[in-house]
């Protein structure tokens, strides 16, 4: 039995998820801690994702601030659990993605793991995506292997859907290698639109989207992006889908009510998930949803409507808190790295083979 901490800061940039897991014959979530992202740091990270002048210095400063926030949260979690740093075998730190371009052979997550080791007194494993990209893979999604480890004992055809800033699927079917891929925007466009229009960070329960109606011409324009017809393995990010991308689509069309745009963005998320399942020829009997999207009542209902032959439910129905799956995954990936266990899945990322992921910063 060993204890690991996972730190995840996703594309939504709402905050840092910190999860403590116990790794033995099973994976158990022990405790969690969440730190909201300060507005100034969030704005700077968003700016780095978009690109601009003096990126090297700006990214160096931003990652120092990110690491200090992460270390603060880790110490708080340890204090709450009355644990000393020596009790933790390693921290799996994803860092913050500021650029993901596997077609050009690189992916960049900032997070200064050396400083995180110094500030916590705990070995840190980070840079999980680069090895898969170096092996010709997409470097994403990485969570399907973890989903497989969590749910491999279950029977039937199951898909695990993570809806964070972007949505990705893991297909777990008996006697088949796990499959997985990014579907497209999850919450990223809905969050950006409601923030621009109403100053809110997200659409609680999808209520604003539910107040509008889908605009077919806008939906058709959004779905015309080449990503949606690209065959997997594939991954995407803010480099492709962002507020300027949405505004460009809107500029070519007549004006729409703001709530109708939100409704259409939710429909885009739901449709691209379902079409991804269909293109994979998946006979999904159960769709388990995690990430922030699991709390979007309107999205969950729409997925259920579009998948009448599948049970659509939160991972909570299987005892796995939907808010902490990704942070748990990076704690588990740290375990895999230290044990020399390959944690990518070529059937998911397209890499040339199995690879041990992560770089180790020993305490």
From Swiss-Prot:
CDD domains: ASKHA_NBD_ANMK. GO terms for molecular function: ATP binding; kinase activity; phosphotransferase activity, alcohol group as acceptor. Pathway: Amino-sugar metabolism; 1,6-anhydro-N-acetylmuramate degradation; Cell wall biogenesis; peptidoglycan recycling. Signal peptide: none annotated. This is Anhydro-N-acetylmuramic acid kinase. One of its GO terms (biological process) is amino sugar metabolic process. The gene is anmK. It comes from Pseudomonas fluorescens (strain Pf0-1). It catalyses: 1,6-anhydro-N-acetyl-beta-muramate + ATP + H2O = N-acetyl-D-muramate 6-phosphate + ADP + H(+).
